[in-house]
Amino acid sequence: VLFGDYQICFQTYADLYTVKPDSGKIARAREVMEYQMSTDKDDYWWWADGLYMVMPVMTKMYKLTGNPLYLEKLHEYWTYANSIMYDAEEGLYYRDGKYIYPKHKSVNGKKDFWARGDGWVLAAWQRY
């Protein structure tokens, strides 16, 4: 459950909660995200689309609960993700922490970025 592919649905539950508040709508999101935040790990977001999937969950849950830990951990996870995927020279993100240059190269030996993933990273900032 501590994986963006499973957590992305929490965005919808948070949105539904704002339409008609009912603690049951966000109970599982709160349980999972607060458990995740209680661990010492900061490497949950190691792939570009994970940022799109979970960053908005963190901001939405902060808005609904007022718990500042959501924003603190968002910053911690974002810092980790940037450290392994962001190429400051190009201003772009690699697909994930395993596809970084020079470990992974394009067929012509150059840096290999993933346009869709970079789009998701930018969209993540717009979803909250």
Model-derived segments and spans:
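Glycan-recognition and catalytic cores of secretory/periplasmic carbohydrate-active enzymes
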Residues: V1-Y128
